[in-house]
Curated annotation (Swiss-Prot):
SUPFAM superfamilies: Cyclophilin-like. This is Probable inactive peptidyl-prolyl cis-trans isomerase-like 6. Belongs to the cyclophilin-type PPIase family. One of its GO terms (cellular component) is cytoplasm. Residues 141-304 form the PPIase cyclophilin-type domain. It comes from Bos taurus. Pfam families: Pro_isomerase. One of its GO terms (molecular function) is peptidyl-prolyl cis-trans isomerase activity.
Length: 307
């Protein structure tokens, strides 16, 4: 549903003193993002002297929800019930969603940019595939249940160009392709649990030995070295390796619940949650006793995506 249209700098087709800047921010795999992107590009191509090149910002699902919350805090009542997967701006002033941009382009600039829904869907599929390929990163998933009730999937982008060894360890532990360790430990996250929830800190899992939180094993042996500390803990959803001190990474991992700069230079972060906003919220909300979940939070399946 289109949101109420907001006032924007231009109300006629007469050339403005300065070219207008259209910005589109949205969920990269939503058709509404493609609709807005197409409208913004049509405005530029039809009126090149009236418009700057459009700023097109595709974001992942988790990042979109974070962005939307920030905008709701910034703009307050103006977008409190905003439900679209895209936001369109003219000279940094909110216009509305994709339909609002189409209507504005038609009313003010006589641009008709309406394509069949099937075409937008096809454009979305092609754009999404290219968007993920262009990252040159690997993607993995964890399916989660709480007390046998499936709550959904966490999807992570692994920064394999920055931390290749750490990412390979996590990726193969997700797929289970390494089989068993020399000590007989099954090197697979499936069946393991989230054993710790630190309020406003992180959720922790990956003890594939006994699930107590005091053990784990990597695909390289019991532990491996800290690869680097290039990735900062500067937001919610950062994925990192738990350790017992320098160079003691195994299989345990954490997902931050907010920015945690105190973890920088001490723990190796190597990825980011990109989908699973509600799932992470469920995990951080489970009742605990001494930071251990009272409910059984299990990884029921894990593997690689988009390979």
């Amino acid at each position: 549903m289109a949101s109420q249209q907001h006032s924007v700098p231009c109300i006629s087709r007469s050339p403005p003193e300065q070219p207008l800047q259209v910005k589109v921010v949205g969920l990269f795999k939503s058709s509404s993002f493609q609709i807005a992107k197409s409208a913004a590009e049509s405005l530029k191509s039809n009126y090149p002297s009236n418009f700057e090149d459009p700023i097109i910002i595709p974001v992942q699902e988790f990042a979109w929800h974070q962005y939307l919350q920030e905008k709701k805090r910034e703009l307050k009542n103006e977008v409190w019930e905003y439900s679209s997967y895209v936001m369109c701006f003219i000279n940094d002033k909110l216009l509305g969603d994709a339909l609002d941009l189409q209507k504005w382009a038609h009313k003010v600039w006589d641009i008709v940019d309406f394509k069949p829904p099937a075409l937008y869907e096809a454009l979305t599929v092609d754009y999404s595939a290219k968007f993920l390929r262009d990252t040159k990163h690997n993607f993995v998933f964890l399916d989660i249940s709480i007390d046998l009730y499936p709550i959904g999937r966490l999807i992570f982008e692994l920064y394999s160009d920055t931390c290749p060894k750490t990412c390979k360890n996590f990726q193969i532990l997700c797929t289970g392709k390494a089989g068993f360790s020399q000590s007989g430990i099954k090197l697979h996250y499936t069946g393991s649990i989230f054993h710790r929830v630190v309020r406003n800190g992180w959720v922790q899992g990956g003890d594939i030995v006994a699930g107590k939180g005091d053990n784990g094993e990597s695909i390289y042996g019991p532990t491996f070295e800290d690869e680097n500390f290039s990735v900062p803990h500067n937001k919610r959803g950062v994925l990192g390796m738990v350790n017992k001190g320098r160079h003691s990474n195994g299989s345990q991992f954490y997902i931050t619940l907010q920015a945690a700069p105190y973890l920088d230079k001490k723990y190796v972060a190597f990825g980011q949650l990109i989908e699973g906003t509600d799932v992470l919220h469920h995990l951080e909300s489970v009742p605990t006793e001494n930071e251990r979940p009272i409910q059984n939070c299990v990884i029921t399946a894990s593997g690689q995506l988009y390979a």
